[in-house]
């Protein structure tokens, strides 16, 4: 009791791989409840507290919204919803001095990748090595690097409504021919 809230980081995620004709309504509902509805509800509850501190709301999206990854339809759709929500909330909450941003991580070493069944624990090193060359910086990212970008948005008093790609340059295309 009595504490203050400077920032809310909406980082809940549910991800699994299924072809378009393989997911169920239950999969879709679970993805939307975890990735979108929880973020909207938490943000709504946080607004009065963030207004007192002129704080920030940060959503964790994904570069899945910028590039097509087969099997990721529900995940990409929910993360795109967070990008749209970022713009709307930034416009709505700006006059109340609350900034809203979205971070779009690329390939990052996280527990979610294992839980999503993207690859087994035995395959993790070889899979990350395989995609490292697709990045302009020649490697995948770390959770700490994503956290640094979150801190940047939280601390920047003149940035709102943006979706920042934190992807080591994978969006630039292959780094060699």
Task: Annotate each PLM feature.
Residues 19-20, 27-32, 131:
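Substrate-binding pocket helix/loop in short-chain dehydrogenase/reductase
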Residues 20-21, 67-73, 95, 138:
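Active-site loop immediately N-terminal to the catalytic Tyr-X3-Lys motif
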Residues 40, 49, 139-166, 171:
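C-terminal substrate-recognition "lid" of short-chain dehydrogenase/reductases
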């Amino acid at each position: 009791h009595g504490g203050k809230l400077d920032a809310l980081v909406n980082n809940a995620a549910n991800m699994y791989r299924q072809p378009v004709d393989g997911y169920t309504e239950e999969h879709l509902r679970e993805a939307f409840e975890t990735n979108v509805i929880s973020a909207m509800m938490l943000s709504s509850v946080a607004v009065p507290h963030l207004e007192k501190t002129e704080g920030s709301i940060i959503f964790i999206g994904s570069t899945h919204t910028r590039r097509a990854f087969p099997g990721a339809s529900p995940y990409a759709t929910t993360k795109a919803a967070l990008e749209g929500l970022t713009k709307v909330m930034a416009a709505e909450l700006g006059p109340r001095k609350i900034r809203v941003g979205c971070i779009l991580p690329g390939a990052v070493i996280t527990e979610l990748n294992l839980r999503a069944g993207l690859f087994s624990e035995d395959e993790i090193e070889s899979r990350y090595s395989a995609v490292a060359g697709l990045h302009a910086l020649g490697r995948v990212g770390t959770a700490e690097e994503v956290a640094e970008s979150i801190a940047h948005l939280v601390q920047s008093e003149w940035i709102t409504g943006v979706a920042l790609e934190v992807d080591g340059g994978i969006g630039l295309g292959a780094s060699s021919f």
